[in-house]
Design a protein with these regions (language model features):
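A metal-dependent hydrolase metal-coordination microenvironment
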Residues: 1-143, 226, 232-270, 276-277
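Conserved, well-ordered alpha-helix/loop/beta-strand core segments that scaffold catalytic motifs
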Residues: 174-224
Length: 287
């Protein structure tokens, strides 16, 4: 069985804007994936649509209800994947918790603009922003990049690309443009309690995305303490040694094992489907 349980569409701000769900489903069919989950950031709107609209002409495999939830726990930002929940109740909850895509991206953008102005950094407020399609951190970073006067600021803080900027502004409290995402996103328990209440399970996404040992230990401890049901063992960023370590941790603690491509249609190397799965029968065996 060929699975991919971590796929995004353009309902997520971080995905390619042309990547509508129809296109994604056709790609999954062409890839001959047996089982997939569309896990858009902070919304499960696709799965509500999928209950109303017949998509079997686009994709003939099994679709598991899914969503990727942004989380902030004690100042640490990461993602949790939710699966197998009631999509309608969850859509209502996600809008109350995160707001619409436009709401949350505009809110983040406005806070960052205020910080930029307070630090007297160069920025063009006349460049339009559309929270429905624009990723707030990307908008701010690319806007600031246009001004050579900001080069010294970027160099001083070791920022050479968008990933550096995003990580600094969401994880480094001493960074001048740090935004406490705990004021924007819920904590682990809020997500776990709700998803469990609507019949679903919660999985830690990309446990080893951070190469910081302290962060990894914090995330794995958080899984066990907050009732998270599983971990995403198989991911393109995980090495063979990473997978071996995570499999051992999951089996020891009787956790659900999942895997996915984290496909968003942006990077040429980011392909649908996952390889090197040791035991397909272990993948997302729901409790």
């Amino acid at each position: 069985m060929n699975n991919d349980l971590h796929i995004r569409t353009n309902f997520s701000a971080s995905a390619d804007k042309s990547l509508d769900f129809q296109k994604v489903l056709k790609m999954c069919e062409e890839k001959k994936l047996d089982r997939i989950s569309i896990t858009d950031f902070d919304t499960c709107i696709f799965h509500v649509i999928n209950k109303i609209v017949d998509t079997s002409n686009l994709y003939s495999g099994e679709i598991i209800t899914g969503m990727e939830c942004d989380v902030c726990e004690k100042g640490v930002t990461f993602e949790l994947l939710a699966y197998n929940f009631d999509p309608i109740k969850t859509l209502v909850w996600s809008y109350k918790t995160y707001g619409s895509l436009n709401d949350r991206q505009t809110k983040i953008k406005n806070v960052l603009v205020k910080l930029v102005e307070e630090k007297k950094l160069k920025f063009d407020k006349n460049i339009p922003f559309n929270g429905k399609v624009d990723f707030a951190h990307k908008y701010i970073f690319e806007n600031m990049e246009k001004f050579k006067e900001n080069n010294e600021f970027f160099k001083k803080h070791g920022i050479s690309n968008l990933t550096d900027f995003y990580n600094a502004s969401t994880k480094q409290k001493d960074f001048p443009l740090y935004l406490d995402m705990g004021k924007i996103w819920p904590d682990t328990k809020t997500i776990v309690d709700f998803i469990h209440s609507v019949g679903g399970v919660v999985v830690l996404a990309q446990p080893l995305k951070s190469k910081n040992r302290e962060n990894i230990d914090f995330l794995l401890k958080n899984v066990l303490e907050k009732g998270v049901d599983g971990i995403e063992v198989y991911h393109p960023t995980h090495t063979k040694e990473d997978i071996k370590f995570l499999l051992s941790f999951a089996r020891k603690n009787k956790l659900i094992i999942t895997g996915g491509s984290n496909f968003n249609g942006k990077e040429p190397t980011n392909k649908l489907g996952i390889d090197n799965i040791e035991d397909q029968s272990e993948l997302l065996v729901l409790k």
